[in-house]
């Protein structure tokens, strides 16, 4: 009869949902998976123990590693006993707890003596990622009166020794490893309240918990966001303060933040220390289930259902680690919410202080178009936390902490269910791989700048060097030129602008590198029909210096290429076969004094290719250069060549003032353009406004304006246009917009002149234009 009810409960959502809706996972399905996984582990415990012994690594950098799986099994059985009263489950959990300390005898005495942290003996629970999984089942069995006094004494001895060991090393701050320690301490305080060391545990627990509770996490990495959030849930659970946790504004923020980062791949894209194959989806699943219940939010329930349906295979009951997490989905979740797919499209996620992400999207299903740009810098928050880690552990390649030099980088581009651009991965060995793999700037889809000028060489027939027959002279590899140890260099970032409309979306971000002496603006425009991305990159020197700038794009495979264009594809991800349904055409329409290269690289745990467009020169103070890239998603059988004829670069009449791209389609011509230096207007400080139209205007083809950005779409009879931060705009001599004059008094020079023209935020219109 029990099995019949389970089947009925599993089928109920099928009747409640529409055909296009994601089906939520009933809580009982989580519970029964946990039960089945615990049973499988119990039935196979002898062979699992043999496997552990056969593969035991006494030289592990992490020291003693106890057998996996058993603590998760014990937690599941203890919880089931708590719910159902099955004595067999309690006995199984107890046996794990009583036997667990015996396994450390596998660790050789000679290795024990080598480690200064083992001066008080080898801990049975050396890993703060999992030691709460020993304490949780003990708390249940003790609370239920299932253990004898001698059994409690033996288990509490193991807990005390292991918790004291955790406190021999110190990691604190608003980050995952600190929060895991706080969680373990909270469970120890709850389960062993009368131990002589409990007062010390309480002190440490409060210190670590205080840093994380109601605070901004200092990490910027998908994997570790998941670890931190799940540890916070466990910490609150141990203290019976889950409701209070979700009342903090930071937790509500993070629930919305990660929801709005969700991509068509069914998960939050990987950024920072992460990679696509294991972005910690299981911990995010628990978090979204818990947050959906806490906030009664159908969209958060949609995120949980999407992740669960994408990743969980309920037939693979061997996954006891997953079962442990899914048990918490049962404990923290609810069946009283129907998922609702979010409706907001392109947006800032969530703002330009903490989140610092921009997402372009046209929907929320697996075939939607999606781009995510990350401009998160280290920022000003969490200074003491970041400095402590910098000073205590070898993390010189990280944007403190677990972040990458990916500021301004495009971490993910998807179209029609296919990944076209992806982040570079975590690392291939500790602390980082060669050249800081994969954290340094040259592993990301971004502009990279170095002081000094690269040796360019020359192609045959060029006149850069003196030999009279003008031979080919090999230049320097741009990647070799950029390479270094991978040590992270502090920079600052800003969002300059973000706008979204029916026909296009636009963003502008800035990176400021005070030490190298440059600023970099990245302007991304998504032209929704025909669905292409125009990327402008402007590097401005803030010092007089020789500099080299390289516009880098990474891929797995080049299918075809021609003059300044490359048809690319990802056919594997993290060295695992991937079946794409689309390709990406990368095209550089601006080519003057720009060199290009295609070089092999090790990235994302596989052999990849980096496509570079670069140049080098001496920069005067304030001088700038620009790069232009068109990113064009393509069908697998689509010929890229017609796009090359349709897309052209249109420079400003006075080179350096602006730049634009023209896209010729069958029924209309689109032009996208931008002002290179947004401060070029500023010519006077003695009165306001500081600018005039004449000081800020530039011409790109038929467009004249002082706008920071413009977008025009011309058909045979109509002209639609958008101009941003603008006083005036003209098209082919016809005035499109003119801001009316206003009064600007109180001039600093004491003059009586009050006439002035300000700038409109933006102006959009459509006019007849033949």
What are the functions of these language-model segments?
Residues 604-626:
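A surface-exposed beta-strand-loop module
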Residues 19-36, 44, 253-254, 272-369, ...:
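Terminal, non-catalytic domain-edge segments
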Residues 1-4:
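Positively charged n-region of N-terminal signal peptides that target proteins for export
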Residues 26-30, 35, 42, 49, ...:
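Aromatic-lined, polymer-binding surfaces characteristic
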Residues 623, 632-770:
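Non-catalytic terminal regions with compositionally biased, polar/charged low complexity
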Residues 548-603:
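Polysaccharide-binding surfaces and accessory modules of carbohydrate-active proteins
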Residues 9-17:
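Hydrophobic h-region of N-terminal signal peptides that target proteins for export
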Residues 316-563, 570, 621-636, 645-653:
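Catalytic and substrate-binding regions of extracellular carbohydrate-active enzymes
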């Amino acid at each position: 009869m029990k099995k019949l009810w389970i089947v009925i409960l599993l089928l109920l959502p099928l009747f409640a949902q529409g055909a296009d809706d994601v089906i939520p996972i009933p809580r009982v399905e989580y519970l029964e998976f946990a039960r089945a996984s615990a049973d499988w582990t119990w039935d196979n415990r002898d062979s699992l123990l043999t496997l552990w012994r056969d593969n035991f690594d006494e030289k592990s950098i992490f020291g003693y590693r106890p057998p996996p799986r058993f603590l998760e099994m014990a937690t599941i059985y203890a919880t089931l006993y708590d719910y159902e009263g099955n004595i067999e489950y309690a006995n199984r959990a107890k046996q794990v707890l009583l036997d667990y300390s015996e396994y450390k005898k596998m660790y050789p005495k000679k290795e024990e003596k080598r480690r200064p942290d083992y001066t008080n003996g080898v801990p049975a629970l050396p890993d703060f990622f999992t030691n709460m999984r020993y304490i949780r089942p003990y708390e249940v069995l003790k609370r239920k009166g299932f253990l004898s006094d001698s059994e409690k004494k033996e288990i509490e001895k193991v807990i005390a020794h292991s918790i004291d060991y955790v406190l021999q090393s110190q990691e604190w701050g608003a980050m995952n490893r600190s929060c895991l320690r706080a969680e373990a301490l909270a469970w120890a305080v709850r389960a062993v309240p009368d131990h002589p060391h409990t007062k010390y545990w309480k002190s440490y627990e409060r210190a670590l918990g205080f840093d994380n509770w109601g605070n901004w996490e200092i990490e910027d990495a998908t994997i570790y966001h998941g670890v931190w959030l799940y540890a916070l849930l466990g910490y609150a659970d141990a203290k019976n303060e889950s409701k209070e946790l979700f009342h903090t504004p930071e937790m509500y923020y993070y629930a919305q933040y990660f929801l709005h980062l969700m991509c068509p791949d069914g998960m939050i894209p990987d950024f920072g220390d992460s990679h696509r194959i294991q972005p910690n989806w299981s911990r995010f699943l628990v978090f979204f289930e818990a947050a959906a219940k806490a906030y009664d939010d159908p969209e958060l329930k949609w995120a949980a259902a999407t992740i669960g349906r994408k990743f969980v295979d309920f037939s693979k009951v061997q996954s006891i680690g997953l079962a442990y997490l899914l048990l918490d989905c049962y404990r923290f979740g609810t069946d009283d919410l129907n998922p609702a797919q979010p409706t907001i499209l392109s947006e800032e996620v969530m703002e330009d202080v903490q989140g610092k992400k921009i997402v372009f999207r046209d929907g929320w299903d697996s075939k939607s178009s999606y781009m995510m740009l990350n401009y998160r810098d280290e920022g000003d928050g969490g200074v003491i936390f970041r400095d402590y880690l910098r000073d205590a552990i070898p993390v010189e390649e990280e944007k403190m902490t677990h972040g990458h030099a990916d500021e301004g980088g495009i971490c993910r581009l998807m179209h029609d269910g296919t990944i076209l651009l992806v982040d570079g991965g975590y690392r291939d060995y500790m602390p980082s791989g060669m050249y800081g793999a994969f954290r340094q700037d040259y592993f990301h889809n971004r502009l990279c700048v170095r002081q000094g000028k690269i040796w360019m060489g020359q192609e045959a027939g060029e006149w850069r060097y003196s030999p009279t027959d003008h031979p080919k002279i090999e230049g320097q590899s741009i990647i070799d030129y950029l390479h270094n140890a991978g040590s992270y260099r502090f920079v600052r970032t800003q969002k300059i602008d973000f706008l979204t409309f029916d026909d296009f979306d636009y963003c502008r971000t800035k990176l400021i590198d005070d030490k190298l002496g440059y600023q970099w603006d990245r302007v991304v425009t998504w032209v929704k029909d025909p669905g292409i991305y125009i990327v402008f990159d402007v590097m401005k020197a803030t010092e007089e210096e020789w500099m080299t700038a390289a516009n880098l794009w990474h891929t797995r495979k080049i299918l075809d290429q021609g003059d300044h264009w490359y048809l690319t594809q990802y056919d594997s991800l993290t060295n695992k076969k991937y079946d794409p349904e689309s390709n990406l055409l990368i095209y550089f329409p601006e080519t003057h004094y720009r060199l290009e290269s295609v070089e092999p690289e090790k990235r994302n745990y596989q052999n990849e290719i980096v496509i570079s467009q670069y140049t080098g020169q001496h920069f005067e103070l304030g001088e700038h250069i620009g790069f232009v890239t068109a990113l064009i998603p393509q069908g697998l059988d689509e010929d890229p060549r017609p796009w090359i004829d349709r897309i052209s670069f249109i420079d400003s009449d006075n080179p350096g003032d602006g730049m634009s791209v023209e896209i010729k389609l069958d029924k209309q011509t689109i032009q996208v353009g931008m002002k290179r230096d947004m401060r070029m207007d500023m010519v006077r400080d003695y009165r306001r406004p500081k600018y005039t139209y004449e000081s800020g205007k530039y011409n790109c083809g038929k467009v004249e304006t002082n706008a920071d950005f413009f977008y025009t779409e011309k058909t045979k009879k109509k002209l639609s246009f958008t101009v941003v931060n603008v006083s005036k705009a003209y098209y082919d001599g016809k005035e499109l917009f003119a801001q009316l004059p206003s009064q600007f008094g109180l001039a600093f020079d004491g003059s009586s002149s009050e006439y002035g023209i300000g700038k409109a935020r933006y102006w959009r219109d459509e006019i007849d234009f033949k």
